Amino acid sequence: QSLWYHYDFASAPVKLSVLAMNLGQEGGDAETRESDTQYMQTVGTYVQFTPASWNLSGSFYYQTGKNVSARKVSAFMGSVRASYSINDSWTVNVGTDYLSGSKKSDATYRAFNPLYGTHHKFYGTMDYFYASDFVNGYAPGLSDTQIGVGYKVSSSVSMGLNYHYFATGVKLESLNRTLGSELDYQLDWKIMKDVSLSVGYSLMRGTSTMDVVKGGNHKSWQDWGWVSLNVNPTLFKK
């Protein structure tokens, strides 16, 4: 069950959203073949403030209840972002996201679960985090600090470059918290009405901590490039 409320303030450039969600997940005992349902609740808010050339936003969400393994949950996430339009062409932005993590020794599960979030939109376009699971029983959370710049070449062409610094949300055993850095570049071209082209390239430089919690070999070259042709026709119009 979900409850969502959104309000646009008439007297100020402020938008406010509130979310409350109750999620039931079925689990059980493989030996007795008995099933049960564990319930976890997520509550939080998102606020956006857009005075003049600024775009400021922040969010906070808290999770409680029990996860599918029947462990008590107490987790949270927070996000703060700011962007500024220097002129009609240039934009700069900074931001930070923090998702709490859990140690293996924790009796209470403290790793925040983004659930149905649009993972590709956040935490870098290479999708190292949350679009794929952590390994070896780790749930370290995530800290993502980013800075970027956008440039509008013309009315139909724009590009952006963003840098991400990733770290675990909690300190794990003898591991360093730093996971690595990612650089994302994207160019968007509106070719004609209903047709656009997007091109991107990303580069990740990981650490030995990344190898432990995500697998792989951080010493190998890690990058990807992509091209997307988007066709969005209007089929029905009054």
Predicted regions and their residues:
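Residues that define the transmembrane beta-barrel architecture of outer-membrane proteins
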Residues: Q1, T37-V43, A52, K72-G78, ...
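Extracellular/periplasmic loop regions
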Residues: N55, S59, Q63, V68-K152, ...
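Outer-membrane beta-barrel translocator domains and adjoining extracellular loop/strand segments
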Residues: G27-Q38, V68-M77, K104-N113, V170-T178, ...
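Repeated loop/turn-to-beta-strand initiation elements of outer-membrane beta-barrel proteins
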Residues: S11-V18, S53-S57, S89-V92, S155-L161, ...
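Residues on the lipid-exposed face of transmembrane beta-strands in outer-membrane beta-barrel proteins
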Residues: L3-Y7, T45-F49, V80-Y84, V94, ...
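Internal metal/ion-chelating core segments
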Residues: Q1-G58
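Transmembrane beta-strands of outer-membrane beta-barrel pores
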Residues: F9, A20-E26, P51-S53, F60-K66, ...
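Outer-membrane beta-barrel "beta-signal"
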Residues: S220-K238
